[in-house]
């Protein structure tokens, strides 16, 4: 869900805002679909189905265009690493966490991705160093993460009945960290067409998850899931992964990386709304407080809030 492309335009038309809102709804829907599916499909098998079906859909979309096959043959090692840190690891961690937490909370924890991206880029790159504003935004985002994880984790340490286990809260955060590494590593794919990069990493991550799912879940022994689960898997793979990537890169081509990154703020509200309407999930006050801290941190990282305040004060 992160990109390192250079910003192209700072002007957002109503059409681009509408597309950005649609993308936020779609990616928020991925947490909803996953919450439905993990009730009947083990996490590793679910990751395999999501990635495999999405990769197939993107290959059908590309139909051999943009040099997809030479790119796969020539850069398969890079695609394997990108697929590992941008798909296989984060998806597996999020789905494992969602066996115990709701769609909304998982989306909020994953919304810390830009915070980790900034911190990792400060060490891993030469051109994206921390500024005072970025550091402040990171602190707010990390504070929001602590608020979200802290109360449940402390209660769990004392054995309170019904509390969410600590690992279920930590795994989505580790998924966000993995996305942060992939954002810096992904810079090496700038010379490829964006759909080729997406198809390449999805193909590679499918190959990574295939032996994991076979050895751990033994999917051939699983009962046939109900129709609602099948539909959730199709929605997760085709809508929230394959189509979302195409939409994401289309917005980025017109609006640039900075504007497109605002989708991170739109994902948790849509996941929370879908979880509330269809799954009966309710957020605690600490969840809302943590989300607001993370949102404030992301707004500072984006930079436009500070620019508006500076302009108003002149």
Each model region followed by its residue ranges:
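Specific alpha-helical transmembrane segments that line the substrate/conduction pathway
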Residues: 45-56, 86, 94-133, 145, ...
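Hydrophobic transmembrane alpha-helices of multi-pass small-molecule transport proteins
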Residues: 58, 80, 112, 120, ...
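Helix-helix packing/entry segments at the starts of transmembrane helices
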Residues: 49, 87, 105-112, 183-207, ...
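Glycine-/small-residue-enriched transmembrane alpha-helix faces in small-molecule transporters
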Residues: 2-48, 84, 96, 156-188, ...
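Membrane-interface helix-cap regions at the ends of transmembrane helices
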Residues: 29, 33-36, 40, 54-72, ...
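Transmembrane alpha-helical segments that form core, pore/gating elements
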Residues: 58, 117-119, 123, 141, ...
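Specific transmembrane alpha-helical segments of multi-pass solute transporters/efflux pumps
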Residues: 26-31, 59-110, 145-147, 237-255
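Transmembrane alpha-helices of multi-pass small-molecule transport proteins
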Residues: 40-89, 114-120, 177-182, 198-218, ...
């Amino acid at each position: 869900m992160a990109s390192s492309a250079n910003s192209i335009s700072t002007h957002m038309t109503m059409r681009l805002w509408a597309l950005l809102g649609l993308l936020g709804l779609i990616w928020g829907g991925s947490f909803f679909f996953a919450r439905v599916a993990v009730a009947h499909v083990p996490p590793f098998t679910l990751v395999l189905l999501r990635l495999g079906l999405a990769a197939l859909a993107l290959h059908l979309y590309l139909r051999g265009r943009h040099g997809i096959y030479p790119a796969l043959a020539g850069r398969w090692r890079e695609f394997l690493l990108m697929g590992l840190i941008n798909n296989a690891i984060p998806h597996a961690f999020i789905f494992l966490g969602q066996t115990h937490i709701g769609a909304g909370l998982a989306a909020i924890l994953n919304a810390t991705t830009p915070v980790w991206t900034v911190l990792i880029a400060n060490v891993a790159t030469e051109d994206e160093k921390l500024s005072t504003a970025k550091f402040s935004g990171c602190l707010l985002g990390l504070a929001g993460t602590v608020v979200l994880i802290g109360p449940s984790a402390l209660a769990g340490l004392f054995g309170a009945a019904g509390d969410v286990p600590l690992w279920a809260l930590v795994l989505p955060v580790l998924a966000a960290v993995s996305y942060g590494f992939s954002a810096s590593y992904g810079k090496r794919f700038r010379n490829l067409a964006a759909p080729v990069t997406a198809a390449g990493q999805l193909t590679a991550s499918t190959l990574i998850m295939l032996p994991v799912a076979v050895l751990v879940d033994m999917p051939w022994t699983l009962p046939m899931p109900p129709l609602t689960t099948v539909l959730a898997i199709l929605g997760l793979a085709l809508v929230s992964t394959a189509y979302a990537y195409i939409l994401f890169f289309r917005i980025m081509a017109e609006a640039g990386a900075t504007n497109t990154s605002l989708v991170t703020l739109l994902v948790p509200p849509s996941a929370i709304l879908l979880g509330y309407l269809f799954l009966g999930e309710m957020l605690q006050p600490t969840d809302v407080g943590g989300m607001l801290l993370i949102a404030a941190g992301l707004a500072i990282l984006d930079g436009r809030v500070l620019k508006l305040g500076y302009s108003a004060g002149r």
